[in-house]
């Protein structure tokens, strides 16, 4: 039996929590405190309007300070009570004929344990706008949409230790890939889309594949019923996401990654910083 089939069999039989090990302190490593952001470019495919669309995705990971009582970025962290977070932005611009889906999801994850403190999502195309916010201080999910369904909804959502699907590309980087084998988790379905809905919380099985994975990556399988995601993370720290085969049929493949103060790169020609394949 192949190593992949053996892993899938182990996933099916995995008891809760077995050998799912997280590395303490991932969010406090020195790389996140160098005053720069990690900006990664992915070649992306996404199912939209009955076709697979080709685009690029941008991931941004950067350390920030949130005002503790409000969960907004502190203008002056030195004079405010703050929470240190890793902010993960997932930015999309997906073409569909005449118009594009312009979308961005932000996860604000506490540096200790990478648990999200807040998640926001915006999506717009020529039909209208949608906005989502989840907050850990109220455990409330707020949806605002142009569409009748979902329309305007405020719903309770307490993760109770479940992982947000939309945060996995960041949170799974905190795994101890050498010690993790297989185990069961709970996953909160995606809210990233033009018609977001109150998500379901599903049982999931996770497993790490090392020996059969391509050189230089750890392969992580996540199964939720008949939905399967496969992530490939670089073996070297900080374990950037190299590839993601998603359960909806979409894919992300890493093309370029740099550390930079992107908020200062506003001059004509600065776009070339992301044009050269490779990692820096």
Model-assigned labels for residue ranges:
Residues 1-8:
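Sec-dependent signal peptide recognition
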Residues 8, 154, 185-188:
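Intrinsically disordered, low-complexity regions
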Residues 8-17:
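Hydrophobic h-region of N-terminal signal peptides that target proteins for export
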Residues 17-142, 177-280:
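Acidic, serine/threonine-rich low-complexity disordered tracts
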Residues 134-182:
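Surface-exposed beta-loop interaction hotspot
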């Amino acid at each position: 039996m192949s190593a992949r089939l053996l892993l899938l069999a182990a996933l099916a039989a995995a008891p809760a929590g077995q050998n799912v090990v997280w590395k303490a302190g991932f969010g406090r490593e020195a790389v996140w405190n160098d005053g720069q952001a990690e900006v990664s470019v992915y070649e992306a495919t996404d199912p939209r309007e009955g076709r697979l669309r080709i685009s690029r995705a941008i991931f941004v990971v950067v350390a920030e300070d949130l005002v503790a009582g409000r969960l907004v970025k502190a203008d002056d962290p030195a004079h405010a009570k703050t929470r240190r977070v890793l902010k993960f932005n997932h930015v999309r611009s997906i073409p569909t004929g005449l118009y594009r889906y312009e979308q961005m999801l932000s996860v604000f994850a506490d540096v200790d344990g990478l648990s999200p403190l807040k998640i926001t999502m915006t999506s717009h195309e020529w039909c209208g706008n949608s906005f989502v916010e989840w907050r850990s201080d109220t455990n409330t999910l707020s949806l605002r949409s142009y569409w009748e369904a979902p329309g305007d909804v405020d719903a309770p959502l307490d993760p109770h230790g479940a992982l947000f699907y939309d945060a996995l590309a960041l949170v799974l980087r905190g795994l101890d890939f050498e010690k993790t084998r297989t185990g069961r988790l709970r996953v909160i379905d995606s809210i990233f889309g033009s018609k977001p809905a109150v998500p379901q919380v599903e049982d999931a099985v996770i497993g790490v594949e090392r020996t059969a994975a391509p050189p230089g990556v750890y392969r992580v399988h996540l199964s939720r019923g008949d939905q399967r995601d496969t992530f490939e993370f670089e073996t070297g720290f900080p374990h950037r996401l190299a590839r993601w085969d998603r359960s909806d049929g979409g894919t992300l493949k890493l093309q370029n990654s740099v550390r930079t103060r992107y908020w200062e790169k506003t001059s004509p020609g600065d776009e070339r910083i992301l044009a050269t394949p490779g990692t820096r």
